[in-house]
Amino acid sequence: MSLISKTAGIVIIGNEVLSAKTQDTNSHFLCRELRALGVEVRRISVIPDEIETIGREVAGFSRDFDFVFTTGGVGPTHDDVTMAGIAHGLGVKVVRHPDLEQRLRERHGKNINEARLRMAEVPEGAALVGEGSLYAPVVRIRNVYIFPGIPKILQERFDVIKERFRGSPYFLQVVYLKEGEGVIASFLNDLLASFPELLLGSYPVLDNPDYKVKVTLESKDQSYLSRALQKLLNTLPKGAVHRIEGN
């Protein structure tokens, strides 16, 4: 059994996140959405608004993963250097995209200025995705998708383009157990020995009187998952299972 997942990396850009002025919720949203689309998020990085750092991180992610998602640093102010950083890392210039410039001029009219026009600057060779559905479409260069840091705007834009990332889904079963990890560890080890491609997780629960551990079993092969679940249930101590949930 082998169903290969597309992989993704997420780069959260912003001094305000690192200094705790803003709490990042974008990575959680993207992880949840991408998982539902069958994409495996392999890494999340939070970095400052520095051109060299952005360039190095995004270039490395672009080599390592099928998709890269960046958030933050695309506004009109002095610390919005994401476009310049990505361009630097990918070895291209920053240019003004004519379609974005036109949209900005139409929106702001006589109030347009150079600060606002900075939001039309993109890495050379970048394309726009989600056009027609969004006031400001998502900028993509190679496998890098560049999003703003404002959660509401990011979510709206991702929702428009998310189907392009869809792969085969993950199937999930969750088993809530009355026994602690010390009791069940050997059963989980045996399960992985029999089902080495199973994605198996074990999470202690401290504040629930009904169960002590939540065990998750995931696979892109539903039959494989069903067999693994049945083996686990057959080997656990009698009465250990509180309940089972899954898709």
Q: Residue ranges of each PLM-predicted region?
A:
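Glycine-rich phosphate/diphosphate-binding loop of Rossmann-like nucleotide-binding domains
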Residues: 2-44, 49, 223-227
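Short coil/turn connectors at secondary-structure junctions
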Residues: 5-8, 63-65, 123-124, 135, ...
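Short glycine-rich or small-residue beta-strand-to-loop segments that form or flank ligand, phosphate
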Residues: 10-13, 18, 67-72, 144-146, ...
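Short glycine-rich anion-binding loops that position phosphate/pyrophosphate groups of nucleotides
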Residues: 15-16, 73-76, 151-153
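N-terminal small/polar loop signature for handling phosphorylated ligands or for N-terminal nucleophile
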Residues: 28-80, 85-88
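Proline/glycine-rich low-complexity loops and linkers
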Residues: 53-56, 80-165
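An accessory alpha-helical subdomain
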Residues: 142-235
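Conserved short beta-strand edge segments in small beta-sheet-based binding/regulatory domains
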Residues: 235-247
